[in-house]
């Protein structure tokens, strides 16, 4: 939360070869949590370091496990909220010039896509809202909690991201790897012609 520390973190990351941060994003039917670091970073323009968001779309629980016990804030889904959510991101976050993109498309990751009642429809809604603003999206799903493979991508994601230690292997269009894979060709990031080439580090 301290601006000076964020600057130091970015400098340290750049020094050791990282070229972007992935911030966890908490959205509960319009209610945001732990948003201060991202909001301050957006307002100040500092650090001048690439970033993206990953939506931690699970229940907010006392045990921090995303489960069904001791739920403090429940994660609920609706088409109305899908539209409100992506509009907020398009208007307030994705426009930032530091935001990580692939082929000009802002990259947005979903932590647990298997929890959505209709992930395919949510993706359709997100892309509709982006198109209405003359934009496109590059959507990724995190392979975790035994939800991994080609069938998970088939609902409309562009790529998959491993989340160790929950996924020992990624499976994308018949390809297997131990690193991030590309949905366009199934190759690892090192072999794909148009991969997500920006290494990222997750931060809350």
For each feature predicted by the language model, list its residue ranges.
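Glycan-processing catalytic domains of CAZymes
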Residues: 1-204
């Amino acid at each position: 939360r301290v601006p000076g520390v964020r600057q130091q973190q970015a400098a340290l990351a750049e020094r050791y070869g990282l070229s972007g941060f992935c911030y966890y994003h908490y959205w509960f039917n319009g209610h945001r949590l732990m948003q201060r670091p991202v909001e301050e970073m957006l307002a100040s323009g500092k650090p001048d370091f690439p970033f993206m968001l990953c939506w931690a779309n699970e229940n907010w629980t006392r045990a921090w496990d995303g489960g069904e016990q001791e739920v403090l804030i429940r994660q609920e889904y609706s088409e109305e909220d899908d539209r409100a959510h992506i509009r907020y991101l398009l208007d307030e976050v994705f426009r930032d010039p530091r935001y990580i993109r692939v082929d000009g498309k802002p990259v947005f990751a979903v932590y647990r896509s298997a929890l959505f009642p209709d992930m395919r429809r949510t993706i359709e809604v997100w892309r509709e809202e982006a198109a209405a603003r003359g934009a496109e999206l590059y959507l990724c799903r995190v392979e975790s909690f035994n939800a991994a493979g080609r069938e998970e991508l088939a609902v409309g994601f562009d790529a998959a991201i491993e989340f160790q230690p929950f996924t020992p292997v990624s499976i994308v269009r018949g390809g297997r790897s131990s690193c991030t894979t590309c949905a366009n060709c199934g190759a690892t990031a090192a072999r794909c012609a148009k991969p997500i080439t920006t290494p990222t580090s997750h931060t809350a």
